[in-house]
């Protein structure tokens, strides 16, 4: 756990669980002033899901289960309680008083994201009323749906936070989150910020590794490193028309899952390690292609999310981006493991300050909007 510091400024607590559903990230954050342009990670923890609950979330997230309303209602309550427990655990371990925390910002757990549907919708579960009730702290949640209601994708939401914390006046930058799904924030020295999903990242890699190695993720990319990229499979995967769509665009497990990869594989018989290497190359290729297509002047890519701990993936990405510095967001003072949770603490702070937090240039929304709903303590 990151060590806490102590001042009198209010704290915000961010809660995040991504498409990989590999745990709940909880981050205590302090902002420098009312503008919320600089922040400090006071403390952070990751709390694993109870195995049966994680199994249900993964199945629901990739569309494998059409869940009865009663079961979905219970799952919503269970996820809310798990988020509350993670917040309470962080507060206890950090040794801070609840009165110091002005609000919790909870992302929830995405179970469906259908921005192309008619009508478009996105759905995150994790009952925020229960978080407020069981922590005694005002909770902000449901950040994506207002952007969707305004004609946007509802994702990604982190580019506004990335711009506030990591923008630079002397170079064109990108922030790359390698979670279950990869997403890029393109931050030019001048001009509009662009942000969008790039396609599958850890979600496919983790699922294949779990199926063939019995481990939840590919530690240090060793499984992928032991295989060779299959050019035919990579070509088939890259042929998916989603990759050619222009921004704004977003996606999730419901589109990119193992059944999708197996369909591309067809009747070919491949070594599991070769498939893992190919899935890793798919992530590197789609990220690099998107970056070169939409901001070829990028000089620095700041990486966060679980993929930052995969040196094989980072090496392949760097090989596809000659002349571009690829480095962890930690080099710029932001812990890559908690950057998204910190971002949802920031979204809570912006909502309470009455400031819009979406970027229409990123999501395609009709205009700036206040994001989220407030559940009082």
From Swiss-Prot:
Molecular-function GO terms, alphabetical: ATP binding; kinase activity; phosphotransferase activity, alcohol group as acceptor
- Enzyme Commission no: 2.7.1.170
Q: Which residues cross the membrane?
A: none
> Pfam families this protein is in?
AnmK
Provide the reaction this enzyme catalyses. Answer: 1,6-anhydro-N-acetyl-beta-muramate + ATP + H2O = N-acetyl-D-muramate 6-phosphate + ADP + H(+)
Task: Fetch the InterPro entries from UniProt.
Answer: Anhydro_N_Ac-Mur_kinase, ATPase_NBD
Q: In which pathway does it act?
A: Amino-sugar metabolism; 1,6-anhydro-N-acetylmuramate degradation; Cell wall biogenesis; peptidoglycan recycling
Annotated GO biological processes are: 1,6-anhydro-N-acetyl-beta-muramic acid catabolic process; amino sugar metabolic process; peptidoglycan turnover
Q: Does the keyword Transferase apply?
A: yes
* Top EC category: transferase
Q: List the disulfide bonds.
A: none
Give binding positions for ATP: 18-25
Keywords (alphabetical) are: ATP-binding, Carbohydrate metabolism, Kinase, Nucleotide-binding, Transferase
In the record, the note on similarity to other proteins reads: Belongs to the anhydro-N-acetylmuramic acid kinase family.
Q: What does this protein do?
A: Catalyzes the specific phosphorylation of 1,6-anhydro-N-acetylmuramic acid (anhMurNAc) with the simultaneous cleavage of the 1,6-anhydro ring, generating MurNAc-6-P. Is required for the utilization of anhMurNAc either imported from the medium or derived from its own cell wall murein, and thus plays a role in cell wall recycling.
The family database entries (PANTHER family) matched by this protein are listed as: ANHYDRO-N-ACETYLMURAMIC ACID KINASE (PTHR30605:SF0)
Put simply, this protein is called Anhydro-N-acetylmuramic acid kinase
Classification of source organism: Bacteria, Pseudomonadati, Pseudomonadota, Gammaproteobacteria, Lysobacterales
């Amino acid at each position: 756990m990151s060590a806490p510091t102590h001042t009198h400024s209010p704290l915000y607590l961010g809660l995040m669980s991504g498409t990989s559903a590999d745990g709940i990230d909880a981050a205590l954050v302090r902002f420098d002033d009312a503008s919320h342009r600089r922040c400090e990670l006071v403390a952070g923890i990751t709390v694993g899901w109870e195995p049966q609950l994680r199994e249900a979330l993964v199945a629901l997230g990739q569309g494998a289960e059409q869940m009865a309303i009663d079961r979905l209602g219970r799952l919503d309550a269970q996820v809310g309680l798990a988020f509350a427990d993670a917040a309470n655990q962080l507060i206890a371990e950090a040794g801070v008083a609840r009165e110091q925390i002005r609000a919790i910002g909870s992302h929830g757990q995405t179970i469906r994201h259908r921005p192309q549907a008619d009508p478009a919708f996105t759905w995150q579960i994790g009952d925020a009323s229960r978080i407020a009730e069981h922590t005694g702290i005002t909770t902000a949640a449901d950040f994506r749906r207002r952007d969707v209601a305004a004609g946007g994708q509802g994702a990604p939401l982190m580019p506004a936070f990335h711009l506030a914390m990591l923008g630079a006046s002397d170079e064109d930058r990108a922030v790359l989150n390698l979670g279950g799904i990869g997403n890029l924030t393109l931050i030019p020295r001048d001009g509009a910020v662009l942000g969008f999903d790039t396609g599958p990242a850890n979600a496919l890699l983790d699922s294949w590794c779990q199926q063939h190695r019995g481990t939840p993720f590919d530690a240090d990319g060793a499984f992928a490193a032991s295989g060779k990229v299959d050019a035919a499979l990579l070509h088939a995967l890259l042929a998916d028309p989603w990759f050619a769509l222009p921004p704004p665009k977003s996606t999730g497990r419901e589109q990119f899952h193992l059944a999708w990869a197996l369909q591309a594989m067809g009747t070919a018989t491949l070594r599991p390690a070769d498939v893992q290497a190919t899935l890793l190359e798919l992530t590197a290729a789609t990220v690099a292609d998107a970056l070169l297509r939409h901001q070829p002047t990028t000089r620095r890519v700041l990486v966060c999310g679980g993929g930052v701990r995969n040196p094989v993936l980072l090496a392949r990405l760097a090989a596809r981006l000659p002349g571009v510095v690829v480095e962890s967001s930690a080099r710029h003072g932001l812990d890559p493991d908690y950057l998204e949770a910190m971002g949802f603490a920031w979204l809570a702070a912006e909502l309470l300050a009455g400031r819009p937090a979406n970027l229409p240039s990123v999501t395609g929304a009709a205009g700036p909007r206040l994001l989220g709903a407030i559940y009082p303590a």
